[in-house]
Amino acid sequence: MQVLSVTPEIFPLIKTGGLADVTGALPVALAAKGVTMRTLIPGFPAVMEGFKKRKAVYQYPLLQGGKASIHAVQIAGLDLFVLDAPHLFDRPGGPYGNASGADWPDNWRRFAALSQAGADIAGGAISGYLPEIVHAHDWQSAMTLAYMRYGKAVGTPSMMTVHNLAFQGQFGAGIFGELGLPAVAMALDGVEYYGGVGFLKAGLQAAWAITTVSPTYAQEIRSPEFGMGLDGLINMRSSDLYGIVNGIDTAIWDPETDKHLVSNYTATTLKARAPNRAAVEERFGLDRDDSPIVCVISRLTWQKGMDILATVIDGIVATGARLAILGSGDAGLEGALLAAAARHRGRIGVVIGYDEGLSHTMQGGCDAIIIPSRFEPCGLTQLYGLRYGCVPVVARTGGLADTIIDANEAAMAAGVATGLQFAPNNGGAMLHAIRRLVDAYADPAAFETIQRQGMKADVSWDKSAEKYLELYRLLLSKRVA
């Protein structure tokens, strides 16, 4: 089976969040099941530096304002099509914004070009390659499905995966004339969205199937609270809506072999976590004692509930727990957390930024990870926590609710608990969960049971890939029918 994946980022080449981890791991997991997935990505500088020998398999004399070409390459074990369009992608800063973090004003043009290329490939533009299914990820790739709908690949089955509905790619109506779509597309059942153009909306409208990254989130986005203005359309498409929990790359995230750890360990050698714990204490300036270390590895944003954390942080310290915080985001939240660290020297440590190696060390050395998101489509850090015996303490929402079994009395008695859950958007509930964690930590045998049960959980891509494969087969059967 030949599947074309279209995405703005892919690990290990370009990553701003969990999307890259998913798009990098899924092709590998599917390959083991007989699926050949090739991935179309933009030619950002970090991507173009990854390969020297360039073989153009398709040329554009003009694509959204300049010359462009598609290259077929293999990098890091991935089969890629790279859209080389220097006028759109060869820029300093991040993939979506400049060095100051402001969005590029022509993002609509940049990702319309990516989507046009995806639809062209689906329509047979590259000699000798014709995908049977096209799988688009998030708003930056969603227009691929609209271009397919109004072009040569209208009969090719397509899937739209929503990793976070909050990011929709909404633009003014004035751009429509430059998208290269027929006038009929600027309609309610096309790309029109509240008087403008909605990239994600267009993908949701055109897709043969829609997936989100957890069953709970698939249900949540049907409500006005989580639907972000798209709940009406999503309810209309509900018979084509599926929730599939992400997996993680268990070769990269393996405490037994992880080179980022000071000390490797397994579920039967948890005491070997101690040197990692010491490394966390040193890096974050924490007191050396026997109290639990709770970590935060997150974007510091409203969605992630970091403002709620900031309001109860003094109470968390009062429970006896220590905090190690790694992340960046809202300047006000960064300041509030740094101020808390200054108030509670030795009890709170904060590192502003993101450090992949440090995140591994934290999972391998901290006792718990708190994830207080207001909404969380899937979440990956709690899966890393399970894998590393870093007990997840999570808000009961989205994929967090689907992947963590709360350590209530019944779950503890049955030996199935893997973490703690609390009501989202509630500082008091978060604080109560931390108190429960501290109490559990005071009983080493019970706490290690939770750790080991989490480490036994299957968080690999195998089950998730099987569910995607089932959906691909369903879509192909619809095409034949």
From Swiss-Prot:
Function: Synthesizes alpha-1,4-glucan chains using ADP-glucose.
Source organism superkingdom: Bacteria
Protein name: Glycogen synthase
Pathway of action: Glycan biosynthesis; glycogen biosynthesis
PANTHER family: ALPHA AMYLASE DOMAIN-CONTAINING PROTEIN, GRANULE-BOUND STARCH SYNTHASE 1, CHLOROPLASTIC/AMYLOPLASTIC
Binding residues annotated for ADP-alpha-D-glucose, in chain numbering: 15
CDD domains the UniProt entry points to: GT5_Glycogen_synthase_DULL1-like
Enzyme Commission number(s) from the entry: 2.4.1.21
Family: Belongs to the glycosyltransferase 1 family. Bacterial/plant glycogen synthase subfamily.
Top-level EC class as recorded in UniProt: transferase
GO biological process assignments: glycogen biosynthetic process
Record keywords: Glycogen biosynthesis, Glycosyltransferase, Transferase
Keyword Transferase belongs to the record: yes
Keyword hit for Transferase: yes
GO CC field: cytosol
